[in-house]
Amino acid sequence: GLGDYRRVHVVSCQDTDITPTGLGAYASRQTYVAGFSIRQTGLLLKEKILDYSAKLTRQAVYNMDIVDGSIVRTTDGKVLMSLSELAMHAQYNPNDSQHITAESTYTIRNNAYSFGCTFAEVEVDIPMCKVTLKDIINVHDCGRLVNPALAEAQVHGGMSMAIGYGLSEQLLFDEKTGRPLNNNLLDYKLSTIMDHPHLEAQFVENAEPTSAFGTKALGEPPACSGAPAIRNAIYNATGVAIDQDPITPHVLFRRFTEEGLIRD
């Protein structure tokens, strides 16, 4: 139907000049992004269910709703049939058997920003150039929590990552060959539960008005503010500002020596 095959262009290497416009990732916002399509598809499926139930109950669609797994009449709340009964009818009715499904596509037009902060308490042994993290609290406004337990676990994971890249995790390379020198868990100092104090996560639930379910991002944000909070706590304790991470004993020794806290 095109008339000329040269009108067809196969794109093998994509860049921003030819791909559709994107509004950005803005951290891990899967619930935010997928929520629009989930809600839209759910409403479409509900519409199809009520359409089919209208045939079985001889009720008007606008006079029915789905409540607690049942089709109910909105005027008096009477249960007309359960969803399981409707599913059996839809599947095995010899006269009108059908699969009730719904599909939809939703293009995201909005973005939502998450807000959060971290409070850290440290103990610094200046002669030993050692930092001990005594306490850390991570607070986030991630919109309405869909799964509080999973949200808390997500924050704990981000805090652990922040402690790691803030104090110990550093990938070393051979300057001549570019070969990684510590590409294993023995030499790469990944923080573990033995390096952590109690990890406390708190939430401020401000529902996002542009979101289908009031949610916002909670993927990367917990890992962002932890290391800067530890750095600022070290500065508050010693008066020494450090502009790199991880803040290892070697870095502390160099900076403490430069500031006169350690003398040869």
What residue ranges belong to the model's regions?
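C-terminal catalytic domains of large/alpha subunits in multi-subunit enzymes
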Residues: 1-264
